[in-house]
Amino acid sequence: MKTRLGGRTWAALLTFGLFGQIAWVIENMYFNVFLYNTISGNTSMIAAMVAWSAVTATVTTLVMGALSDRLGRRKALIVIGYLLWGVSIGAFAFIKRSPLAGAAHSAAVLVVVMDCVMTFFGSTANDAAFNAWVTDVTVPENRGRVETVLAIMPLVAMLVVFGALDGLTQAGNWRLFFLIVGGITCLGGVLGCFFIREPGLPRGQGSYFANILYGFRPAVIRGNPR
C-alpha cells in the first residue's frame, strides 16, 4: 500500500474527523444543559442519560464494528450512519417543555431515549465504521500523522461550537442550534458519498459473535498492548 495519502482521502479524514467531533461535542456538553434548562431540572435524568448513552456507545461500537468487519464494508455504515445521526440530532429541535410535571417527566425520558438513539447512530458511523476505515486506508508509516491530525479535531470542534454556536444556546434558541448541528452532520454523510472509497476488504470469516469476543481474549490483549 502507498504511504502517501491522496487528496480525496485527506478530504474524508478532515471532514469526518471534524464533523463527527462537532456532533460529539453537542452530545457530551450540551444535551445535559438542554435537558436541565428546558425540559426538567431533575438531575437524576441527567445521570441516567449519561449512563445509558455510555452503555449504548460501548455496545454499539463492539457490535457494529464486528458487523462492519463481517460485511467487509465501511462506506455504507459511515454514509447512512452520518445521515441518521444528523436527523436524530435535528429531532431534538422539536422537543418542547411542558408546565405539567407528568408531561415534563415524559419529555425528559424521551430526551434520554433519543440521546441513546443518537449515540447508536454516532457510534456506528464514527466509532465503529470511520475509525476502522482510517485503519484500512493507512499504513504504519503514515498512521501516526493521520492519528495526530484526528486527535486535534476535538479541540477544533470545541472552538467551532463555542465560537459560532454557543450564543444560540445562551439566547435560548435551541431549535436553530440543533438544526444547524444536525444539518452539518447530515452534510458529512452526503460528502461521504464522494470522499469515501471502499478499501475492498474481504468478508469476515467465522462466527459473528466469536469476532465480537475476539478482542477480549487474553492472548489478543497481550499481543496488542497499545
Predicted regions and their residues:
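Central cavity-lining transmembrane alpha-helices of secondary-active solute carriers
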Residues: I46-S68, V87
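Glycine-rich segments within core transmembrane alpha-helices of 12-TM secondary carriers
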Residues: T56-T58, G144-T169
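Cytoplasmic membrane-interface "Motif A"-like loop-to-helix N-cap segments
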Residues: R70-L84
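A membrane-interface helix-boundary motif in multi-pass transporters
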Residues: R74, G102-S106, D166-T185
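C-terminal ends and interior cores of transmembrane alpha-helices
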Residues: I80-H105
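C-terminal membrane-cytosol helix-exit motif in multi-pass small-molecule transporters
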Residues: G183-P202
